[in-house]
Amino acid sequence: MTSIYTSDLKNHRRAPPPPNGAAGSGSGSSSGSGSGSGSGSGSGSLTNIVTSSNSLGVTANQTKPIQLNINSSKRQSGWVHVKDDGIFTSFRWNKRFMVINDKTLNFYKQEPYSSDGNSNSNTPDLSFPLYLINNINLKPNSGYSKTSQSFEIVPKNNNKSILISVKTNNDYLDWLDAFTTKCPLVQIGENNSGVSSSHPHLQIQHLTNGSLNGNSSSSPTSGLSSSSVLTGGNSGVSGPINFTHKVHVGFDPASGNFTGLPDTWKSLLQHSKITNEDWKKDPVAVIKVLEFYSDINGGNSAAGTPIGSPMINSKTNNNNNDPNNYSSAKNNVQEANLQEWVKPPAKSTVSQFKPSRAAPKPPTPYHLTQLNGSSHQHTSSSGSLPSSGNNNNNNNSTNNNNTKNVSPLNNLMNKSELIPARRAPPPPTSGTSSDTYSNKNHQDRSGYEQQRQQRTDSSQQQQQQQKQHQYQQKSQQQQQQPLSSHQGGTSHIPKQVPPTLPSSGPPTQAASGKSMPSKIHPDLKIQQGTNNYIKSSGTDANQVDGDAKQFIKPFNLQSKKSQQQLASKQPSPPSSQQQQQKPMTSHGLMGTSHSVTKPLNPVNDPIKPLNLKSSKSKEALNETSGVSKTPSPTDKSNKPTAPASGPAVTKTAKQLKKERERLNDLQIIAKLKTVVNNQDPKPLFRIVEKAGQGASGNVYLAEMIKDNNRKIAIKQMDLDAQPRKELIINEILVMKDSQHKNIVNFLDSYLIGDNELWVIMEYMQGGSLTEIIENNDFKLNEKQIATICFETLKGLQHLHKKHIIHRDIKSDNVLLDAYGNVKITDFGFCAKLTDQRNKRATMVGTPYWMAPEVVKQKEYDEKVDVWSLGIMTIEMIEGEPPYLNEEPLKALYLIATNGTPKLKKPELLSNSIKKFLSICLCVDVRYRASTDELLEHSFIQHKSGKIEELAPLLEWKKQQQKHQQHKQETSDTGFA
């Protein structure tokens, strides 16, 4: 199939004599007049004489049988369904054995064999010369059956077309390859719109040796290249075209290898236990597993690699990656990441979920150089204000060219200089037009400087005096760490000059990628009031003070994280607008500087602790981004701004979409405050020991001090360390709204400060089902298994009736108490289905318990929990889930391909439990049982018992407690 023959290319034109010297008819024309006069000879292995008067050139009964060489490698054959587009036959599909040879397309009622003596079996029922094919129209997802693929052969004489339906997609592609090989000049595509010899699944190029070019259809001899060699015998004519078959990612059945694989995928396959037999068995499943793993590391799941991390930047699905950049070290890191992905997230590995990047180096863009330079001066030497505006002009001219990496977000702010407040601009993109923006900024700034000089000549002396007074006042504010309106105004206004920010922010904050606090919106409102003061002549400074008090007052109620997100959502500090409103901004308000500044001091005291915290974060943000958004040349405090454009450029569109879909920090804090208790929980509880960890935090055993030392479980979560904070709110809301005897009871929740969350739950003394299985030597009888499944099913039924999917059912998340009660916990991955979205398609959970539809990235519903319950049942039978000893990539492949896992010793189990497993682990979701059906199953109805019968499983726990108590008493006696 990889050879192209001159006779195939030029059957529709005058052809040279064949190698055996037989005279060719040579009368066939490309017009396809319907005379049926093609070349009368072919290769030695095939002879075709078309004698029918049919306008198609097709004969139903040949006077001379076609001689077939069944073992020829140039032949594609197989069973298909055929019909034409006639009025009476368009609804009938006839099953035929189709064979494409060098010259004809033949259809047989039965498979032809050259070895038997029956000549009728080798007589085609229908024969179609290849030179009469005008084009081939693809009709995917249509045909004889629902899974069939079809294509239409259109003849040149505008007669009836032939529709051919192929059963499988692989056969469909093979046939298209065969037609591409035999008829390279025939157009193949949907609705005759495709390019020559192409179909939607393949990218095919024909590389000629020089003579065959785009004008080959008009030149009768253009198809004959210098490399064409005529040979005798059965080999025919050698191929004049170097045929290449390129696909994005494909599988070559001949070699048994994948084609077009990215280097990262190749490395994963080489280091995995997926064998060549696995590849040949189901190559589509291998590709699905690789895509699944890539999406997990691309941030599509809760445990995925975060945005902006180096892991994502090295993925092959990014548009800007280079396959040559993949090294073995990176591949090893990705393997290790896959190994870590199946483990519960530990607090020590939290840093891998944060975007890590180095702080950009100076020089900074033009309108930010003065800010950064003055900020460093201020930090190191308590600061000093420039003596005149000339310094600003000099620095502006010096740094005017340093705008190559300025994001359009900053330039957009300069375009709207006269607007004090506006909606958040779009996410920053590549700053390719920075030069244009910088030139415009320079022109606008030059015009503004001239205008300011004209209006301020008369007040220069007063300005100098006020500046000295302002500096003294600023030093006082620095010692008190006041909350000044650091986001807006020029440095010439004492109201807008903040204290020196301490440089105690550790550099690790910048590297960890934490979003820093930004108190922007209260000051934004203050600036609006100030601008109104400037624009209205009848407004005095007291009105500005009142506005400042009014808008700063609620600021104390907001947390650091809410301010952080607001800074990223409203990255428009009004200092640039304030500075460029009018010259009165920098000079006209000097007389009111005392009254403007003093009212701010009383507000600073209650906010002082928050401000101390945020000042460090602002320092780290400056180190992280290296770019500030305000063009004010002397403002020393405009640091908490939107992120720099550098890291944002590396984000893919998919990641940005995920970011927009997530709750921002302000919404998260607001939502948390409606759920949690604002009381300090530390005086209420006494932590005893660490009990374990879940998907979103550590769990501690504690005692309630005011409730007779009642034992409870406290789940502590650091909000700053959570990659997706909305999952935490999701977990709290589900537990709070899902009060059930088979779900771990939610007691209360507390938010300490602005980043530490405590969730109080009932304590399950028996521990997890995993511990019970391990400490009982994997000897759970069927009655105990049925009882645990029964209790778990009741909890799942309650969730599913609320249209909630747990999505992480496994033995680690099923707990028992001292009385044998079985309860479900860890709702960090749960999801709620709605009428608008009654199926999910995200990839969360633990791989070994995942349903096949999740691994294959198909839509799923509540029945994924039923599959996980079946895997958990196998855990109780065999001590571990299937494929646990396989490395994760191979396990994902086996889940996707094997379907229902096999039991190690099924002969030891009863029929009822095997039937129970069969309907839990049914690959076809339509036939998989629901929780309601499972509760009515005979295994649950007849085998399950009372929860008290589970008490023997907890004997190991009692023995462990006695041993610890004895050890404690011994140690106390020794000290005594």
From Swiss-Prot:
PROSITE patterns: CRIB (PS50108), PH_DOMAIN (PS50003), PROTEIN_KINASE_DOM (PS50011), PROTEIN_KINASE_ST (PS00108). It is an enzyme of class 2 (transferase). This is Serine/threonine-protein kinase CLA4. Residues 313-332, 371-411, 456-487, 559-583 have a biased composition (Low complexity). Belongs to the protein kinase superfamily. STE Ser/Thr protein kinase family. STE20 subfamily. It catalyses: L-seryl-[protein] + ATP = O-phospho-L-seryl-[protein] + ADP + H(+); L-threonyl-[protein] + ATP = O-phospho-L-threonyl-[protein] + ADP + H(+). The keyword Zinc does not apply. GO terms for molecular function: ATP binding; protein serine kinase activity; protein serine/threonine kinase activity. InterPro entries: CRIB_dom (IPR000095), CRIB_dom_sf (IPR036936), Kinase-like_dom_sf (IPR011009), PAK3-like (IPR051931), PAK_BD (IPR033923), PH-like_dom_sf (IPR011993), PH_domain (IPR001849), Prot_kinase_dom (IPR000719). Residues 23-43 have a biased composition (Gly residues). SMART domains: PBD (SM00285), PH (SM00233), S_TKc (SM00220). One of its GO terms (biological process) is intracellular signal transduction. Residues 496-505 have a biased composition (Pro residues). Residues 685-940 form the Protein kinase domain. Residues 1-46, 207-231, 298-522, 559-658 are annotated as: Disordered. Gene3D superfamilies: CRIB domain, Phosphorylase Kinase, domain 1, Pleckstrin-homology domain (PH domain)/Phosphotyrosine-binding domain (PTB), Transferase(Phosphotransferase) domain 1. It comes from Candida albicans (strain SC5314 / ATCC MYA-2876) (Yeast). ATP binds at residues 691-699, 715. Residues 430-440, 622-635 have a biased composition (Polar residues). Its EC number is 2.7.11.1. Pfam families: PBD, PH, Pkinase. Interacts (via the CRIB domain) with CDC42. The active site is at residue 808. Disruption phenotype: Leads to defects in morphology and hyphal formation, impaired chlamydospore formation, reduced colonization of the kidneys in infected mice and suppressed virulence in the mouse model. Residues 237-250 form the CRIB domain. One of its GO terms (cellular component) is cytoplasm.
